[in-house]
A protein has these predicted regions:
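Short glycine/proline-centered loop/turn elements that form peptide/ligand docking sites
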Residues: 6
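Shared catalytic-loop signature of beta/alpha-barrel
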Residues: 9, 15-18, 26-152
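Extended hydrophobic packing segments that form well-structured cores
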Residues: 154-186
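Short, small-residue-biased leader/transition segments that mark boundaries at the very start
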Residues: 1-2
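Phosphate/pyrophosphate-binding betaalpha-module
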Residues: 23
Length: 186
């Protein structure tokens, strides 16, 4: 953990928005070491699946941003509960929004963002025009901001006729294996 503490300290002159997932979530004491060694903001949460996993890092103020994946967390209601638990500790949200989640989850992220007082930043993939064609109503980026659709619900829909033009092609995320064949995390 000394390496991570030193890294966080050496990154200070670069004024990172945050250092993301520097540790596995169960290493609470190591978060404390990094926190004591550096002023670089810390973000954690992609591996969390419940609000209960987040709580120890909140109550001890060991992170600055919570980065859960709303789809893995249990949806909008659970994400709002996590945000409510984080807010008294001045912890902001930075929901996980990579390219391997679809437009509906990005819609959910933005809807939570605009409904909470401790929104920080939103990781976002800007989908190509064909995705916008198939999923009208996905969040739009205009004037330096993300805008949710004003349509009911999540605001996005599926255009089934447009989807027929782009048949499904099976794809897989890489499997992370060590040289001995054992599976490890990303």
């Amino acid at each position: 953990m000394l390496f991570r503490s030193r890294l966080a300290k050496e990154l200070e002159p670069h004024h990172l928005f945050f250092l993301e997932d520097a540790l596995r979530p169960e290493h609470k004491e190591s978060f404390r070491l990094i926190r004591n060694a550096s002023t670089t903001p810390l973000a954690m949460g992609e591996l969390f699946h419940t609000k209960y996993e987040c709580l120890p890092l909140f109550t001890e103020q060991l992170i600055d941003f919570i980065r859960c994946d709303i789809g893995h967390l249990g949806g909008i209601t659970e994400a709002k509960k996590v945000a409510i638990l984080a807010e008294p500790y001045s912890i902001q949200t930075a929901w996980h929004g990579p390219g391997d989640i679809g437009p509906a989850t990005h819609c959910a992220n933005v809807h939570v963002d605009v409904s909470i007082p401790n929104f920080g930043v939103q990781e976002m993939v800007f989908f190509p025009e064909i995705v916008q064609e198939v999923f009208p109503g996905a969040p739009e980026y205009r004037d330096g901001r993300l805008w949710p659709s004003e349509k009911p619900g999540l605001g996005c829909d599926i255009n089934e006729e447009a989807a027929k033009k782009y048949p499904y092609q099976r794809n897989y995320l890489p499997v992370c294996r060590r040289a001995d064949g054992s599976v490890h995390d990303w």
